[in-house]
């Protein structure tokens, strides 16, 4: 079964780069441009993994993670934060909100795909 991944980032070019990498590895990709937009994309979808930026307009990534973890259908869905922030305090804040993994941009595609594969394991 193909796994579906929601990619949330306010940068269209970053969503495109991540999307190409994931699609080439056989994943189905849904995109959201910020946390609020991404929440609307979750309705009626089955998503196996969420990859989210932290700093976004309208709704930031940490607030988005908190909202997702309150949703019955997604409370156990793994979330990876993919961000330019390397601050340990911010990372702890993301983990406390419910993010399972934290990857700093720029990243190597192989690194991203390795993390995705681990997070998508049953």
Name what the model sees in each region.
Residues 26-33, 41:
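Short hydrophobic/Thr-rich beta-strand motif most characteristic of the beta2 strand and flanking loop
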Residues 56:
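Receiver (REC) domain active-site loop signature in two-component systems and cognate sites
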Residues 100:
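Short, glycine/charged-rich "phosphate-handling" switch motifs in NTP-dependent
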Residues 107-117:
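C-terminal output helix
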Residues 53, 83:
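Active-site residues of response regulator receiver
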Residues 46-51:
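Active-site beta3 strand of CheY-like receiver
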Residues 16-24:
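Charged docking surfaces used in two-component/phosphorelay signaling
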């Amino acid at each position: 079964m193909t796994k579906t991944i929601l990619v949330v980032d306010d940068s269209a070019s970053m969503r495109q780069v991540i999307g190409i990498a994931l699609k080439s590895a056989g994943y189905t990709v849904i995109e959201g441009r910020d946390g609020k937009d991404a929440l609307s994309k979750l309705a009626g979808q089955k998503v196996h993994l969420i990859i989210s930026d932290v700093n976004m307009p309208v709704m930031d990534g940490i607030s988005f993670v908190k909202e997702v973890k309150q949703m019955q259908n997604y409370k156990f869905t793994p979330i990876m934060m993919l961000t330019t922030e390397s601050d340990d305090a911010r990372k702890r804040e993301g983990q406390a909100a419910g993010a399972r993994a934290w990857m700093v941009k720029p990243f190597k595609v192989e690194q991203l795909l390795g993390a995705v594969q681990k997070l998508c394991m049953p």
